[in-house]
A protein has these predicted regions:
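SAM-dependent methyltransferase
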Residues: 155-227
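C-terminal lobe and adjacent flexible extensions of AdoMet/dcAdoMet transferase-like proteins
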Residues: 222-260
Length: 260
């Protein structure tokens, strides 16, 4: 019988279950890896971060950003709260002949990162809104501030919730994919409750014989506004807080550790 770990945080459990399928949420994951790597490399370079500087992808998932930057030669480490996502990233690195230090860690604490040790920290793909309160988000920002060296750069991407209509329930299909002779369909359902919403991810696989299997993964998000995030960044001690709309498919926020 498999072990059941009752101590796994809900967000970690969600991404543990999603890790084998995550690439299928993209029309072409390999292309997205390359495209996002190039976009982030240009952004980092514009802020003076070089390939030799120490960088942490602190919400790495299965490696959509880490793999692209590692392929371009960046000195990148990667962490995530999901063990299964980190293990999937390790497999992807080996398959590509790439190298990056990987570990399980919590974005709110980054307990394994030394203070003032990093030139840049990344947290992309709407990872911040998994933190369900301003208090938790502020803790994550203060932790990033601790880990960055003077002048260091924080980069994260989020949904612009203020621009989204509130439909309840909100059904969001990803589209049909094909894998190993099977058809795969992923659908998100958002159910709003105030400024938060429960997300149900329906993953359906159809075999060549027509047999279907559906698994439902559940998580919760805080629809925090970009304006509020900018305020929390300033409260955490960051300066030069900027929004960029032309880097990734979601808005990107950058902020710097003050130069002493």
């Amino acid at each position: 019988m498999g072990r059941i770990n009752t101590k796994v945080p809900p967000v970690a459990a969600f991404y543990d279950d999603l890790a084998p399928h995550y690439h299928l949420l993209y029309v072409d994951w390999e292309r997205s890896v390359a495209k996002q790597g190039e976009a982030l490399a240009s952004l980092l370079s514009a802020f003076g971060v070089t390939v030799a500087d120490p960088i942490l992808d602190a919400a790495c998932g299965i490696g959509t950003q880490t793999l692209g930057l590692a392929r371009l030669g960046f000195n990148i480490a990667a962490s995530d709260i999901s063990l299964m996502a980190v293990e999937r990233l390790q497999q992807e690195l080996v398959q590509r002949g790439l190298s990056a230090r990987t570990r399980v860690d919590d974005l709110r604490t980054l307990a394994q990162v030394e203070s003032s040790s990093l030139a840049a920290i990344l947290a992309c793909d709407n990872s911040i809104p998994h933190l369900l309160s301003d208090r938790d988000i502020l803790q994550a920002f203060r932790t990033a501030h601790r880990c960055l060296r003077p002048g260091g750069l924080l980069v994260f991407s989020v949904r612009d919730y203020a621009a989204l209509p509130r439909v309840n329930p909100d059904v969001r299909p990803y589209g049909l994919r094909h894998r190993d002779g099977c058809r795969f369909l992923a659908v998100q359902v958002w159910e709003w409750e105030g400024e938060q919403y429960d997300l149900s991810m329906y993953l359906t696989s159809e075999s060549s014989s027509g047999e279907c299997n559906t698994k439902v993964l559940r998580s919760r998000y805080y629809a925090v506004s970009i304006e509020r995030l900018q305020s929390l960044l300033a409260e955490a001690g960051f300066v030069e807080v900027e929004r960029h709309n032309d880097i990734l498919f979601q808005p990107v926020l950058t902020a710097r550790q003050r130069v002493v």
